[in-house]
């Protein structure tokens, strides 16, 4: 199979979908890897490293898309990339379709086979979402701490405080991978941290593994509202796999928050769990509503591309190899790869996305028989 790796073109997105080491593995299995020139530059990988790994360097994205049987990406295809996608071509990337009807419809019209990293399940976990969730969770506190500084429009609060000066209050909505990593980072900096979640089992686990400055609270609208007036940094970290994130904080709720408090909504790529959050970029990451600073960058890990690219390839490569070996039709018979299938041959096959837009959903097994 010809596996194509185009350069990412989302604003200030410097990750690449495959390391040279990953290219070596694919080439060793008999596949042909085509990489757009400079695709790995932002992550510190030269064209020569890909050539040494056995890959071919192509001069444009158009060539990569035209030649490849399977496209590997990091972020969802941008409009000009969708225009290059073709019927029967496989695309393996983060799609987050439930947050973007226009992209969903465009891909349905393209007729490509769309396998989403973020919905691939293994024993109840999301192994291809986990590494980027880990990065985003840690970054949410780094970026939130910076946004709390007065020159950034924040309250001028140091997360860890000082001897004789109280630390900041960090409230984390969701105790999954993102929330856990955010809590670890904030606690490590000395903040007082509260994690809200709906799973008692998860909260028992967090109580066991977290330091003493982290507490858990059963999530409810009342519990969230009770914490907002004293919250310095609010991290949105809720996830419903493949579906739009639930809205937990309304615009009206912001009025009870402190002036200069900060919200980092990591769920923004799934629609966001804060009503006032809309996607921003690394170039202009923040905006202010009701006196509250909002950080809503949808590709946070893109700011640390080298770390993120290694983490991504480490997780995705076994599934990339399997998908390249099987092809889309056979892959739909594999439990894990079938869970990643969102669109097959121009038809939607992921219920949460269908529900988000009121579209028809189809059985992946039935679609496989028609290929």
Please tell me what each predicted stretch does:
Residues 31, 86-90, 110-112, 258-261, ...:
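A short helix->loop->beta-strand "cap" motif at the edges of active sites that frequently abuts
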Residues 66, 70-148:
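Phosphate/diphosphate ligand-binding glycine-rich loop within oxidoreductases
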Residues 54-67, 217-227:
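Short acidic low-complexity segments
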Residues 23, 47, 104, 141, ...:
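Generic hydrophobic/aromatic pocket-lining and core-packing "Φ" positions
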């Amino acid at each position: 199979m010809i596996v194509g790796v185009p350069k990412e073109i989302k604003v200030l997105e410097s990750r690449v979908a495959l390391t040279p080491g990953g290219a070596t593995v694919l080439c060793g299995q008999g596949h042909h890897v085509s990489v757009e020139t400079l695709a790995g530059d932002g992550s510190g990988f030269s064209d020569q490293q890909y050539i040494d790994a056995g890959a071919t360097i192509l001069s444009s994205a158009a060539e990569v898309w035209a030649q490849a049987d399977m496209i590997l990406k990091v972020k969802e295809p941008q409009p000009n990339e969708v225009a290059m996608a073709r019927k029967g071509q496989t695309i393996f990337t983060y799609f987050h379709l439930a947050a973007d009807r226009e992209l969903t419809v465009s891909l349905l019209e393209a007729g490509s086979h769309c396998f989403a990293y973020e919905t691939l399940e293994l024993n109840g976990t999301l192994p291809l979402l986990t590494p980027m969730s880990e990065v985003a969770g840690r970054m949410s506190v780094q970026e939130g701490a910076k946004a709390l500084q007065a020159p950034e429009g924040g309250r001028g609060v140091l997360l860890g405080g000082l001897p004789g000066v109280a630390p900041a209050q960090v409230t984390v909505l969701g105790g999954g991978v993102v929330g856990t990593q955010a809590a670890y980072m904030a606690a490590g900096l000395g903040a007082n941290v509260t994690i809200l979640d709906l799973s008692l089992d998860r909260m028992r686990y967090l109580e066991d593994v977290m330091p003493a400055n982290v507490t858990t609270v059963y999530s409810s609208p009342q519990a969230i509202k009770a914490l907002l007036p004293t919250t310095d940094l609010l991290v949105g970290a809720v996830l419903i796999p493949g579906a739009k994130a639930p809205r937990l904080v309304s615009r009206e709720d912001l009025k009870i928050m402190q002036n200069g408090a900060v919200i980092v909504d990591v769920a923004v790529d799934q629609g966001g769990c804060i009503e006032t959050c809309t996607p921003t970029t690394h170039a202009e990451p923040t905006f202010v509503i009701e006196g509250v600073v909002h950080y809503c960058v949808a590709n946070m890990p893109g700011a640390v591309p080298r770390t993120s690219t290694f983490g991504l390839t480490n997780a995705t490569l076994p599934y990339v190899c399997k998908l390249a070996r099987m092809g889309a039709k056979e892959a739909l018979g594999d439990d894990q790869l079938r869970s990643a299938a969102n669109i097959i041959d121009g038809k939607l096959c992921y219920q949460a996305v269908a529900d988000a837009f009121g579209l028809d959903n189809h059985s992946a097994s039935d679609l496989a028989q028609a290929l």
